[in-house]
């Protein structure tokens, strides 16, 4: 956990060293992670985020509103992102969520969804690489609740159904990945952040990054 003062000071150091290149992402995390060491600490995430932003704004070197984005999924956090930040950076979402997020944010704020990708044409290989990875996130209530709001069923989440897997993880060749990116853009995304998974989760997926860079 970081204090508003720590975050504002780190932002100031980064911009002083590297210019106006850094966009600060702020997220409230998840109850199972926060409460693991301090049970009961995770309460009222919307109010906690607003209070954290108040703290940043009260520092000697506040982070400009347009240089910070919120890890927003639900309508209330998206509304806060529109009011108090430069936009939203949703994680583990579909193009349909991007469409709803754009409607919630309005035309001005940035919308920067994450899209997980696996560069393989083999469905079995894609599922072998991505299913356990996805299962870990489905155990976190914030993501699970957002997917339930998005029309997936409890069975989809419990079984990591093919329908859910294919909606959250884009797999295939570069053309297939770019089609998914285009769907997000058509739904209102300003930028799509690609996270590449590979057979070795401990290795940087440099080959995948290079292939995606050429395709993009």
Can you annotate each of these PLM segments?
Residues 1-216:
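Active-site-adjacent structural elements that line small-molecule/cofactor binding pockets in enzymes
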């Amino acid at each position: 956990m970081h204090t508003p003062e720590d975050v504002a000071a780190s932002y100031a150091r980064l911009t002083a060293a590297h210019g106006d290149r850094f966009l600060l992402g702020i997220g409230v995390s998840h109850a199972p992670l926060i409460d693991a060491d301090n049970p009961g600490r995770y309460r009222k995430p919307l109010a906690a985020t607003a209070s954290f932003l108040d703290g940043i704004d009260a520092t000697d070197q506040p982070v400009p509103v347009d240089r910070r984005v919120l890890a927003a999924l639900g309508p209330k956090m998206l509304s806060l992102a529109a009011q108090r930040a430069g936009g939203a950076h949703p994680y583990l979402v579909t193009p349909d969520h991007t469409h709803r997020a754009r409607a919630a944010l309005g035309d001005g704020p940035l919308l920067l969804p994450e899209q997980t990708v696996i560069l393989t044409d083999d469905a079995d290989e894609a599922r072998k690489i991505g299913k356990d990875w996805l299962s870990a996130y489905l155990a976190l209530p914030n993501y699970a609740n957002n997917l339930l709001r998005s029309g997936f069923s409890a069975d989809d989440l419990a079984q990591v159904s093919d329908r859910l897997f294919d909606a959250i993880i884009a797999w295939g060749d570069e053309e297939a990945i770019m089609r998914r990116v285009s769907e997000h853009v058509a739904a209102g995304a300003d930028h799509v952040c690609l996270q590449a998974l590979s057979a070795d989760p401990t290795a940087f997926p440099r080959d995948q990054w290079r292939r995606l860079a050429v395709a993009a």
